[in-house]
């Protein structure tokens, strides 16, 4: 039986970091890219959650709190975050409709697209072990 981790919980953040480490997916692109991305998710069952992805110098990490240094910050509410994470809403549609707000270096974000491709591999693996319910 697979043990589920609640989306955006400390255990989920740890599971993403563990998968990132196990697959090495981001390490391959971390030598060519240097970016700190902070995610802020509001209105979750446990308040506002802040976590980040830090990539650069051949290393990648995923942890609670803001990126240091932070190049890009995404902000969204719980319903948007869960809809995007479960594939019920594309991130592109969420941006276009103003449901995800972006602050920071947009050019660095565009230059870092290979990072997001590698991160998708990590999220796809963790998604199968994630509980997206909003039960507190």
Pin down the residues of each PLM region:
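Feature captures hydrophobic
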Residues: 1-136
């Amino acid at each position: 039986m697979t043990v589920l981790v609640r989306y955006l919980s400390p255990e989920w953040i740890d599971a993403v970091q563990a998968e990132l480490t196990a697959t090495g997916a981001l390490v391959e692109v971390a030598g060519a890219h240097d970016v700190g991305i902070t995610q802020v998710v509001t209105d979750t069952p446990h308040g506002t959650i802040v976590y980040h992805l830090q990539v650069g110098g051949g290393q990648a990490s995923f942890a609670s709190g803001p990126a240091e240094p932070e190049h890009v910050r995404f902000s969204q509410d719980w319903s948007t975050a869960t809809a995007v994470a479960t594939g019920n809403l594309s991130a592109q549609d969420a941006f276009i409709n103003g449901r995800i707000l972006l602050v920071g270096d947009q050019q660095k974000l565009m230059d870092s697209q290979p990072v997001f491709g590698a991160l998708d591999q990590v999220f796809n693996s963790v998604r199968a072990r994630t509980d997206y319910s909003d039960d507190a």
